[in-house]
Amino acid sequence: MKQGIHPEYKEVTATCSCGNVIKTRSTLGKDINLDVCGNCHPFYTGKQRVVDTGGRVERFNSRFKIPSTK
């Protein structure tokens, strides 16, 4: 590797809004604030909801004559 052309790789702390603190390394060089992390994201916590907004699936199926699977 060439000397002097690579950015410094520093230890940073990523803090989530839920209070979870993650220590990692980054070239950013300053602490990071996160909105969501693996501890509070709905997909990982199992609290994810599938929202059918305004019957769009039924509208699509009726438009293309796809029989309902229910």
From Swiss-Prot:
Zn(2+) binds at residues 16, 18, 37, 40. Its cofactor is Zn(2+). GO terms for cellular component: ribonucleoprotein complex; ribosome. GO terms for biological process: translation. Binds 1 zinc ion per subunit. PROSITE patterns: RIBOSOMAL_L31. It comes from the Bacteria. Belongs to the bacterial ribosomal protein bL31 family. Type A subfamily. Part of the 50S ribosomal subunit. Binds the 23S rRNA. This is Large ribosomal subunit protein bL31. It comes from Haemophilus influenzae (strain 86-028NP). The lineage of its organism: Bacteria, Pseudomonadati, Pseudomonadota, Gammaproteobacteria, Pasteurellales. The gene is rpmE.
